[in-house]
Amino acid sequence: MSKIIAINAGSSSLKFQLFEMPSETVLTKGLVERIGIADSVFTISVNGEKNTEVTDIPDHAVAVKMLLNKLTEFGIIKDLNEIDGIGHRVVHGGEKFSDSVLLTDETIKEIEDISELAPLHNPANIVGIKAFKEVLPNVPAVAVFDTAFHQTMPEQSYLYSLPYEYYEKFGIRKYGFHGTSHKYVTERAAELLGRPLKDLRLISCHLGNGASIAAVEGGKSIDTSMGFTPLAGVAMGTRSGNIDPALIPYIMEKTGQTADEVLNTLNKKSGLLGISGFSSDLRDIVEATKEGNERAETALEVFASRIHKYIGSYAARMSGVDAIIFTAGIGENSVEVRERVLRGLEFMGVYWDPALNNVRGEEAFISYPHSPVKVMIIPTDEEVMIARDVVRLAK
């Protein structure tokens, strides 16, 4: 038996989950928030109860030391020698990393070298990696990349129709994200369907505040909706998804905003928030539609119809589909979004049961038994995928 800790470091946060492997039992999980800001918050769950402490945590290294102290203080582990491996979520692996990788000084430098591809995320991920390396230098650590799963996409999927030298010189191409989640739910779908993954054509819909759709054929990603950055694809909580690129100079001219300001609007003030005018939270939007709010209704329809279009396009791309999977916060919990996305897909063999769809947050088939295309809800588990990769690579 081994104990593996899965880490997701943000710019001012650190999420953690400790697993007993290979049973995949979760021993504890928690979150450090507001790192480097006054009144940092440390939350850890012990025997199902949440313990919260407000204190000053100036940087990630202090957060890591506090986390490790709490593991022993609460008796979750006897001492730090019990930790056999650390898995770090890293958002962007570029073209360099098509699989998770054991972290060495060399691989850390390579991750730093591609940080410009994900300036909001990778630097924070690296801070987390270095903080653990400082405190537990001899424990094997693994980086698990959001982009790695999509490195199987063929050229016709990942190339933009731009001058080819942009790709050669600057690495401008589609990378795709949420790969760890898409990989988990498609592997789990094969288990639930009782069929080999290599024989399946699957469409995975990871719908959270960020959302992406993936076409997975024979267990390999062949296309996905996000692009060079996580801004592309479907409309999201605050992100615009795909727009006409010529809009950017047009908006700059009309509003007097700089390019960075327009980009900030596309990333943080668009999507559900932009259209509804009041919230990026889908639950608020759904409630408002029940009260007759027309802008909320429009926001919900835009969100669902973009997903609906990707499903149709990916089914065409794979010459059919065996199952459609809904996952992540919205995909797992929003009865209304699933209903709107699936409406009208009967022409391609999708027959779903409204009664079965009335489920939240648990594994379920929501299609009729006779439906040629199965529709499934599979709660994602990116952390367990990280732990599995640590076990696989740190042997």
From Swiss-Prot:
| Keyword check for Metal-binding | yes
Note how its activity is modulated.
Answer: Induced by glucose excess, the induction may be mediated by CcpA transcriptional regulator.
Specify the pathway: Metabolic intermediate biosynthesis; acetyl-CoA biosynthesis; acetyl-CoA from acetate: step 1/2
Q: What's a single GO MF annotation on this record?
A: acetate kinase activity
Sorted alphabetically, the Gene Ontology BP terms of this entry are: acetate metabolic process; acetyl-CoA biosynthetic process
User: What residues make up the catalytic site?
Assistant: 146 (proton donor/acceptor)
Q: Could you tell me which CDD domains the record lists for this protein?
A: ASKHA_NBD_AcK_PK
Subcellular location as annotated = Cytoplasm
Q: Which InterPro entries match?
A: Ac/propionate_kinase, Aliphatic_acid_kin_short-chain, Aliphatic_acid_kinase_CS, ATPase_NBD
Q: Which cofactor does it need?
A: Mg(2+); Mn(2+)
A Pfam family that the UniProt record links to this protein: Acetate_kinase
Q: Where is this site: Transition state stabilizer?
A: 178, 239
Listed binding positions for Mg(2+) are 8, 382
Q: Which reaction does it catalyse?
A: acetate + ATP = acetyl phosphate + ADP
Q: Where does substrate bind?
A: 89
Which GO CC annotations does the UniProt entry carry?
cytoplasm
Q: Where does ATP bind?
A: 15, 206-210, 281-283, 329-333
The cofactor note reads: Mg(2+). Can also accept Mn(2+).
Q: Which cysteines are joined by disulfide bonds?
A: none
Q: What is its main location?
A: cytoplasm
Summarize subunit and interaction data from the UniProt record for this chain.
Answer: Homodimer.
Family, according to the entry, reads as follows: Belongs to the acetokinase family.
Role description: Catalyzes the formation of acetyl phosphate from acetate and ATP. Can also catalyze the reverse reaction. Appears to favor the formation of acetate. Involved in the secretion of excess carbohydrate.
Q: Report what the protein is called.
A: Acetate kinase
Name the species this protein comes from. Answer: Bacillus subtilis (strain 168)
Gene name, please? ackA
